[in-house]
Amino acid sequence: MFAPENGKLLGAQIVGFNGVDKRIEMLAQVIQRGGTVHDLAELEHAYAPPYSSAKDPVNMAGFVAENILNKKSRIIQWRELAELPADTIRIDVRTHDEYKLGTIPRFINIPVDELREHLDELPKEKPIVVTCAVGLRGYLAYRILVQNGFKHVRNLSGGYKTWSVATAPIKEIVSHKPEIPESTSYGLSLIH
């Protein structure tokens, strides 16, 4: 979470397994120093090429936030979908198989790998919203459209996964219990 007027980092949340603690620590240090998303993009960290990349997910989060601040990427939040004008073109750029498993109402399926083949079918003057699973392919589709003269394009922040969790009935979210391992690889019990 960052302040849109200056990019100051206000908070962070990470969901995952391996390396989450390391990355939250990196983010906490930037927040403690009153840092910005620009600091995230420039953050240096130790890494070994066989085990991680030169650009950490924390750096990538900084790049995404910088693109939003610098207007290189326009996003829309899931709450705003209901307020879109009726003539908005809504495109789900996931694969056909992913789309069949579920989609956001009124979104048509044009996989990102096929988008260039359909550019002449899309009206350049109408607003367009793109989505994918979590945002990366949506960003790629956004760039394809903008670079081909489409002016009113936005990418759904967090993609289909964020929308599906945000709009799911609370009972459905609460009833989903993750599996908790009973022991670690060291034979230590995790359940007391």
Pin down the residues of each PLM region.
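C-terminal catalytic lobe of FAD-dependent flavoproteins
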Residues: 1-40
